[in-house]
Amino acid sequence: LAIGLGITTRDDLWMSRFGRGQAANRAQFRAELAEMVTALEHFPCIAAWVPFNEGWGQFESRQVAEWLKRRDPTRLVDAASGWFDRGAGDFQSRHIYAIKLRRGRPDQRAFALTEFGGYSLKIPGHVWDENQRFGYKFFETAEALTEAYVKLLDEQLIPLISQGLTVAIYTQTTDVEIEINGYLTYDRQIEKMEAAVLRAAHERVYAAFAAAILAQTGRGGAG
């Protein structure tokens, strides 16, 4: 589907939060990482490999990232998505929720906001569990959610683009079990925000990225 739509993706290897200190577990991780790359490397939609996410099972980040770059020099590596950055890989990768969006100390790597937002709205009758919910900021109406979302993009995300932001990944496309922070409900039946409003807001984001590319390279991006 991603190939057909012309969408690039990031592929991450699921890692247990426990057992990172055991040699056998590390060896198993490395073996499964190698198997994953071999199985998926022929898909051109994959733009980056992500060995570790939010510190889960993370170990020897630099060595793992360097191995990935040798194994597949055609793709980027996000060595530690979100937390516990060890200066490895191609991205300074951050997850930011509930506080103002900002970048860390600049270095030679690309600045990537690999998770942000998580704005949540429950639509009764369209959730996985009526009695549980998870999100980072909750709203009671679609209008309030939309207003806050557009403000987040216009006042916080877009200014970061001129500061070197290269990636912005919003949480998230759909509700996932008790997580109610999707653009769509869990059953994919309800759009929580009007598509026309989202399109207009997203076009401003795309335009800001295109302007940043033009300023840095002298060449505009495809809008």
Sequence positions of predicted segments:
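Substrate-binding/catalytic cleft of secreted carbohydrate-active enzymes
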Residues: 1-200, 210, 217
